[in-house]
Amino acid sequence: MVRNRFLANRKSAKTAFCKEFRTMAHYNTVFHTLAKILPRHEIDRFDRKYGQGDKRRQSSRYVQFIVMLMAQILDLKSLREIEQAQKSNQKRLYHLGVKSPVSRSALSRMNDERSADFFKDVFQQMLQSCKALAPGSQFKLPGVNSLILMDATTIQLCLDVFPWATYTQTKGALKLHFGLNDDGYLPDFMVATTGKVHEINVAKSLDYQPGSMICMDRGYTDYDWWEELTRKGIYFVTRLKSNAVYDEIRRRAGRRSKNIVDDETIKLKGIQTPFRLIHYISPEDQHEYHFITNAMHLPAQTIADIYKERWQIELFFKWVNQNQKIKIFLDTSANAVMT
C-alpha cells in the first residue's frame, strides 16, 4: 500500500516535471525566435543615444533588454530567477550577444538608474515594423486618415511599496493610456502615468494628425478640447453625458437607418462651435445612445458603427491582461517599473 502510494507520487511528480519542462522549452523557443528578429542595429543606436557617460565595464542596454525580454517571456518572478535562467541558457544567450550572465545586483541597478526612455524608443521602433505587416482597417471613411480608439487601463499597486504611484489616499496605481489604431489594432501611442492622472489630461497633451478620428468614452468629455480638435481638422466620436446642456440648431435631413431616432446639429452651453448629436437605438439591447461628433459628412449609422468599434480596445486590454505577465515588479522605483 505504501509502495503503491510512493509510486503514484513519483509518477505524479515526474508528470508535473515533464509538463513544466515542455512549457519552459516552448517559452525558450518563443524567446529565441523573437530575439533573433529584433532590429539589433536600431537598439544599438538607441544604446549610443542614452549610453553617454555610462561606465565602460557596465553591460550594454541591448544586453539589459535581452535579459528583461527573457524574464518576461519565461515568466520569471525575481532577480534571482533571472540570474539562474541566464546560467541555464548561457550558450543560447551568448549567440544573442549576452557574453556573460548579468548579476541580479547589476540588473537591479540598471533598471533603477538607466532611463526607461530607451525602452520607449525600442517599443516605437518595433511597433513601426509591426504596422508594416498589419491588415488594413475595415472602415474606409471619406476624409478620415486613421481611426484611433482611445482608453486607459489601471494596474493596482501597493502605496506603501510604491509611494510615488499615488491614486487615492490609501491606494496606489499605474495607469496605461492607449491609442489603438483601427488599422491593424496596434497602438499608435502608450503613455504610462500614476493612477491619479486623468485620461483627459493625457489626451490633451498628445499631437494628432489632421484628418484623424478619435473614438473615446465619456471620460474624455471636455468641450473646449473638442472645439480645439475641430479647429485643427481632427474628428472625434464619443457619447454625450446625460446632464449636458445644449440648444438644438436644426434637425438634419437625409435618409436614416431604422435604428437612428434623431440626427441634429446642436450647440453646447458655453461653446460656439456646432456639433452633431445622433440618437441611436441599439438593436442588441434596445438601449438608446447619444453620440456626439464633429464629423458632419458621415452617415449617422456610420457614426454609431464607429463607436461600436471602440469595443476593440476593451478586447485589447483583455488580451494584454491575459498575455502580459505583470504580476510582480522587480524593483519599486518609478524608473524600474516603467522599464
Give the label of every model feature segment:
Residues 87, 102, 106, 208:
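Acidic/polar active-site rim loop that often engages polyanionic ligands
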Residues 95-114:
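Major-groove recognition helix of helix-turn-helix-like DNA-binding domains
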Residues 2-81, 85, 112-114, 121-125, ...:
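Single, function-defining residue in the core of a domain
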Residues 87-97:
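Extended, structured, electrostatic nucleic-acid-contact surfaces
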Residues 165:
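A glycine- and small-aliphatic-rich helix-loop capping segment at beta-alpha/alpha-beta transitions
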